Amino acid sequence: MSFKRPCPLARYNRTSYFYPTTFSESSEHSHLLVSPVLVASAVIGVVITLSCITIIVGSIRRDRQARIQRHHHRHRRHHHHHRHRRRRHREYASGGHTHSRSSPRMPYACSPAEDWPPPLDVSSEGDVDVTVLWELYPDSPPGYEECMGPGATQLYVPTDAPPPYSMTDSCPRLNGALDSDSGQSRSHRQQEQRTQGQSRLHTVSMDTLPPYEAVCGTGSPSDLLPLPGPEPWPSNSQGSPIPTQAPMPSPERIV
C-alpha cells in the first residue's frame, strides 16, 4: 500500500489562489462603504456653495434697487418742490399778498410720501422760508376787515349794548362815581387789599361798587320791576342819608 505525497507546489498554488480572492472581495466592500459618504459630502458642499452665492447676489441686488429707488424718490421730491415753488411765485406775483380760498388743500394722510410738502426748515437765526409756509398753510388767516369790518363774517359783534351800561357812555359816569365814593371806601379797599395779599384771591366787595343811580342816572326810566319794601332814604349834598318817617305799610306792599 503506497501513499502519495502531495505536491507542495500545488499547495502553494492553492493558497495563492485563495488569498487574492479574499483581498478582492474586501476591497469591493470598502469601495461600497466609501462611495455614499463621498457623494453626500459633495452634494452638501454644492448646496452650501449655491446658497452662499444666492444670498450674496440677492443682497447686492437689493442694495442696488434700494439705492436706485432712493435716488429716484429724492429726484421726484426735488422736482415736486421746485414745481410748487414756481407755482406759488406765479400766484404771488399775479394775485398780490392775498391767497384765494380755491388754493389746493393739504394732502390726505393716505397720499404717498412724495406728495407731502418738504419739512419746515428753520435756520439758526430763526428765519423761515416763506414759500415753505405757503405750502404748509395755503389759506391765510382772516384779516381785520373780515372780523371787524362792515361785512364781517368771522365774528359776530352785537349792535345793542346790554343795559344798564353803554359801550360809549359808561366809562365817564363810572369813573366819576368811583371818584366821589373813593373817600368813603378807601379804608375798605385797603383792608381788602391786605386780605387779597394774604389769600391771593381776587374778590370784589359790594361797598366799592357805585350805586345804580350814580351809573344810570335818576331821571332815566328803567325797565326793571320795583322790589317790595321800604323806599330808599334821600341823601343830602354830603352823601349822608336823611332819616325820614317810615311810611305806613299799605296792603299793596304786604307780601
UniProtKB/Swiss-Prot annotation:
Location of region: Disordered: 69-109, 160-255
GO cellular component terms listed in the entry, alphabetical order: membrane
Residue stretches in coiled coil: none
Keywords from the UniProt entry: Membrane, Transmembrane, Transmembrane helix
Bilayer-spanning residue ranges: 37-57
Compositional bias ranges of the Low complexity kind: 217-226
Sequence ranges of Basic residues compositional bias: 69-90
Polar residues bias: start-end ranges: 193-206, 234-243
UniProt subunit comment: Interacts with NEDD4.
Name this polypeptide is given: Protein BEAN1
Organism listed in the record: Mus musculus
Gene this chain is encoded by: Bean1
